[in-house]
Amino acid sequence: MAQMNFGGVVETVVTSKEFSLEKAREVLKNETIAILGYGIQGPGQAGNLRDNGFNVIVGQRPGKTYDKAVADGWVPGKTLFSVEEAAEKGTIICMLLSDAGQIAVWPKIKQYLTPGKTLYYSHGFAINWNDRTGVVPPADVD
């Protein structure tokens, strides 16, 4: 592990020496990683995971960004779904929608966050200000 300084905060960071790509593939081999949103962060994160051998699907509403996902090789009905369907199919749910998008889709996807699934955010306005947004994950979701 390494000690790294992030803006004056020193954190211990796990490196590839302790947790290799091969180990990550083994640990996640039975998981479906659902990337919700294909705007700013989605293409990079989804493509990186896919290119490194992980089972990845994308959830995106129809429109220009959906068309971009198709152009990038995501296949409708196979690796590209509606946001709701991707949330249902995924075991690891990556919330990459805009803050406003997260708030808008939350009522539609929370039913798919079932026990044992993992939910993560790359930016967290909606979850950090849940008293204002209503985005409150179930207690049995990691």
Residue ranges and their predicted role:
Residues 113-114:
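Helix-to-beta-strand junctions that scaffold the AdoMet/dcAdoMet cofactor pocket
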Residues 90-91, 117:
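Conserved acidic residues
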Residues 96-98, 123:
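Glycine-rich, N-terminal phosphate-binding loop of Rossmann-like dinucleotide-binding domains
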Residues 2-75:
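NAD(P)+-binding Rossmann beta1-loop-alpha1 motif at the extreme N-terminus of oxidoreductases
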Residues 93-94, 120:
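N-terminal Rossmann-like NAD(P) cofactor-binding module of classical short-chain dehydrogenase/reductase
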Residues 74-90:
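Short acidic low-complexity segments
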Residues 118-142:
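Rossmann-fold NAD(P)-binding glycine/threonine-rich loop
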